[in-house]
């Protein structure tokens, strides 16, 4: 079956019995072949094929944008991260990664994968240059969004260095054809300001009380003292409030019906990210 990849030329899609066979075919970068396991829903099969076309186009244009989200209220930060990921997924190939321990991302987005961020980070540590070939099974899909379920081992998050997160994210974006990667910067990340520093755009949740707002001010003061004035000035602060109580079962579906989501969507122009 010939797949017309437009400006990237014509590629041949090979339907395989096993994921391992598909990955082996995809490692032959010069043969213009796309290996796909045929035992999956049709929309996932099409998504996999299109990813390789996008990968070629994004490599040429250098259009990958990393979006970092930070804040001292974990729940609000995760909601803001998900909202950003959902908005961006409507206009470009988007991946969401939460570096929060016990973030419940897999529960929110109904993950059925047996692999998660722990597996992806393990592959990354084994081979920084080729790890993207071994994390395909860790990438899940929800509507138009791709995501990696949260790590099942807290130490995997606590042990990773900021510069490793940056290399990890850039490697995935470069090799797997994402336009946007949204990073939920969790509490266990050491020196989260360094992760913000490698992002193209940064967001932070506004505080609801005196203590939380003081923590934000102290963080900004520290970053300025460290010469990160430009990052502090570029942070977009968002007040995250849910209009109604939302259960885990319908959180993803109800996100667009909240005021903060609409405000976020009206101020975020993905085409200019």
Give the role of each language-model region:
Residues 1-2, 13-17, 68-70, 97, ...:
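Conserved beta-strand segments of the P-loop GTPase G domain that flank and frequently precede/overlap
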Residues 8-66:
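Extreme N-terminal, non-catalytic leader segments
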Residues 9-11, 16-18, 30-32, 91-92, ...:
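Short, well-ordered alpha-helix to beta-strand connector turns
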Residues 63-109:
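Walker A/P-loop phosphate-binding motif and the immediately C-terminal alpha-helix
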Residues 91-147:
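Phosphate-binding loop that captures ATP/GTP phosphates
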Residues 130-139, 149-185:
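Cytosolic-facing regulatory segments adjacent to core modules
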Residues 167-258:
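Conserved catalytic-core segment of NTP-binding enzymes
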Residues 251-273:
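NTP-binding/hydrolysis catalytic cores, primarily Walker-type P-loop NTPases
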């Amino acid at each position: 079956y010939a797949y017309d990849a437009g400006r990237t030329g014509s590629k041949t899609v090979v339907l395989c019995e096993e994921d391992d066979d598909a990955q082996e075919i995809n490692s032959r970068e010069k043969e213009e072949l796309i290996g796909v396991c045929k035992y999956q829903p049709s929309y996932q099969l099409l998504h996999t094929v299109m990813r390789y076309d996008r990968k070629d186009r994004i490599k040429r244009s250098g259009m990958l944008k990393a979006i970092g989200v930070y804040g001292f209220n974990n729940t609000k930060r995760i909601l803001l991260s998900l909202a950003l990921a959902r908005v961006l997924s409507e206009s470009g190939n988007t991946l969401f990664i939460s570096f929060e321990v016990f973030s419940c991302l897999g529960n929110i987005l109904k993950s059925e994968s047996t692999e998660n961020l722990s597996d992806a980070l393990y592959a990354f540590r084994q081979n920084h240059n080729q790890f993207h070939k071994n994390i395909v099974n860790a990438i899940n899909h929800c509507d138009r969004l791709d995501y990696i379920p949260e790590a099942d081992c807290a130490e995997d998050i606590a042990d990773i260095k900021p510069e490793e997160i940056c290399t990890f994210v850039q490697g995935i974006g470069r090799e797997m054809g994402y336009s946007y990667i949204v990073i939920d910067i969790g509490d266990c990340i050491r020196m989260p300001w360094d992760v913000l520093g490698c992002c193209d755009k940064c967001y932070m949740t506004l505080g609801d009380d005196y203590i939380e707002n003081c923590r934000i001010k102290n963080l900004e003061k520290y970053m300025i003292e460290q010469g990160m004035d430009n990052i502090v000035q570029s942070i977009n602060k968002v007040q995250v409030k849910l209009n109604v109580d939302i259960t885990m079962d319908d959180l993803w579906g109800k996100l667009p019906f909240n005021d903060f989501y609409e405000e976020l969507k009206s101020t975020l122009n993905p085409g200019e990210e």
